[in-house]
Amino acid sequence: MTAKVSLEEKFRETGGKRPYVQRLFGRIARVYDPMNRLMSFGLDQRWRAFAARYLALSSDELGLDLGAGTADLSIAVIRNSGPGTRMIGMDITPEMLEVGRIKIARLGLEDRIDLQVGDAEHIDLPDNSVDGCCSAFTVRNLTDIRQGFREMLRVVRPGSRVVCLEISHPPGKMFGFLFYLYFYKLAPLFGTIIGKAFEEYNYLPNSLTTFPDAPTLKAIMEEVGWSDVRFYRLSGGIVAVHVGTKV
């Protein structure tokens, strides 16, 4: 049985991909941040800072962070934006948001970051209501990638950007081999030994099997209506930041 079939069977057992992902991240919420630091060798914070600089909201503007999780990207956007900038962070997993709220309170940012339970494919906001939208490691978990990008396009104001940070497929044989070795072999091992969560961290490589590479994701964004779409490969292409504008 292939990894893809196995993952699809897990989705069926839990009623679909969305409830599976919600349950999975709920179980690892308390170890999510330290495991991210460990598994990325600390690079995940640099990647988020890079993405945040491309969103870089002006003073008093409102941004939206989809799949906000523990709020690292929302915090990075606030740090890279003008005074009075505010963020709405949405995620389908309450346990992740609770970790994020503790972090936000510790930093004294409660009046600038509002975390809410919400679905990136059905955003509970009016059309043209935010000045920018971002996500980190969220698009891969969507049931329908195109629907997610359509919703992002709907809620941002004309002239605003979307910035998406995602694990990607690096070009070239050397980085491709290292990518395969790390994400398909070592990451589940780290998750098992340190996080005691084999299924959760085995989901990571399995979810990448059918996830589009950076040029294909760019084409999907253009297909649903985003303009001036470009992407930036980081760390040899193991992650990519996609940027698009609503005209």
Where are these regions (language model features)?
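Conserved alpha-helix/loop element of class I SAM-dependent methyltransferases that forms part
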Residues: 34, 41-61, 76
